[in-house]
Regions:
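Boundary/entry segment of secreted carbohydrate-active catalytic domains
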Residues: 1-15
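Structural preference for beta-strand elements that scaffold enzyme active sites
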Residues: 3-5, 30-34, 54-60, 98-102, ...
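Active-site beta-loop-alpha junctions enriched in small/polar residues
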Residues: 9-11, 36-38, 60-66, 104-106, ...
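A short alpha/beta connector and helix-capping loop motif
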Residues: 16-40
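Acidic (Asp/Glu)-rich catalytic clusters
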Residues: 21-27, 42-58, 90-94, 163-167
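Glycine/small-residue-rich loop that forms an oxyanion/phosphate-binding "nest" at active or ligand-binding sites
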Residues: 66-89
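Catalytic domains of cell-wall/extracellular-matrix polysaccharide-remodeling enzymes
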Residues: 87-164
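C-terminal domain-boundary segment and adjacent tail
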Residues: 186-228
C-alpha cells in the first residue's frame, strides 16, 4: 500500500495562506498542515483548525522571518529556549500536542541546532520531518535557484508525477498553498495560488484513486505505528 501525507506549511503566516490551506484540504488533497505560532494570523489559524478535525496539525517552528533570523542559530541556548517556547505555545493555543514537527526554511536540518529538534521529538514521541520512516519529498515548490520562479514544479503534471513515484510505505509531500493578499507580500507569494490550483485539480484526485494511494495525516501514521 502507498500512503501519502500532503502537508501544507506556513499555517498562520497570513489570512490568505490560512484560507488557501483550508481550501486545499476541503476541495483537494491536503491532509495535514504545520502551524506557525508567532505570526500575524496564528489565532485565526487555530480557530480554523478546530473546525476541521481531520486536518492534522503539526508545529512549524519559526526561527526565521521572511529572510531574517529571529534567533541566532549559533546561540544554541537561545535556539533551545525559543524551541521550547514555541512548542509550549502550540500546546497552550490548541490544547493538544502537535502531530509532528518541522520548521520554517528547514532550519531543523542545520547541523548546529538539529540535535535540539531531535531531542524534542524523541521526548514526546513525535515524527520530525526527514528523521522518521516517512520519506520526505520537498520537490513540489515553485522557486529554486536564486529565488527564480519555476512554475513547472508546481504544475498539475508535476504533482501527478510525484504521486506516481511515491514508493510503498509512507511519503510526505510538502506544499505551500495560499491566496495572495495585498497586506502580505513575501518572497514566495503568487506561486501559492498556482500550488492551490494543482492541489485541488480533479485529475490529481483521479490519479490517487488509480494508483491505489491512501491519503493520511501524521496522526493516522502514529496510530498505525502504535498498532504495529
Amino acid at each position: 500500500m502507498h500512503y501519502v501525507i500532503v502537508n501544507a506549511d506556513d499555517f498562520g503566516n497570513s489570512e490568505g495562506i490560512n484560507r488557501g490551506i483550508i481550501a486545499a484540504h476541503e476541495q483537494g488533497i491536503v491532509t495535514s498542515t504545520s502551524l506557525m505560532v508567532n505570526t500575524p494570523a496564528t489565532a485565526a489559524a487555530v480557530k480554523l483548525a478546530r473546525a476541521y478535525p481531520n486536518l492534522g496539525l503539526g508545529l512549524h517552528v519559526n526561527l526565521t522571518g521572511e529572510g531574517e533570523r529571529r534567533v541566532d542559530l549559533e546561540d544554541r541556548q537561545a535556539v533551545k529556549r525559543e524551541l521550547e517556547e514555541q512548542f509550549n505555545r502550540f500546546v497552550d493555543l490548541t490544547g493538544q500536542l502537535p502531530t509532528h514537527l518541522d520548521s520554517h526554511q528547514h532550519v531543523h536540518r542545520e547541523f548546529n541546532v538539529g540535535h535540539l529538534f531531535i531531542k524534542l521529538s524523541l521526548r514526546y514521541g513525535l515524527p520530525l520531518r526527514g528523521y522518521s520512516e516517512v520519506v520526505y519529498n520537498s520537490r513540489f515548490y515553485g522557486q529554486w535557484e536564486y529565488g527564480k520562479t519555476e512554475e513547472r514544479y508546481i504544475s498539475v503534471e508535476f504533482l501527478i508525477s510525484l504521486l506516481k513515484a511515491a514508493k510503498r510505505g509512507i511519503t510526505e509531500i510538502a506544499c505551500h498553498p495560499g491566496y495572495v493578499v495585498a497586506e502580505f507580500n513575501p518572497v514566495y507569494n503568487w506561486e501559492r495560488e498556482v500550488e492551490l490550483k494543482a492541489l485541488t485539480n480533479p485529475r490529481v484526485k483521479s490519479v490517487i484513486e488509480e494508483e491505489g494511494i491512501q491519503l493520511i495525516n501524521y496522526q493516522d501514521y502514529l496510530r498505525r505505528a502504535e498498532v504495529a
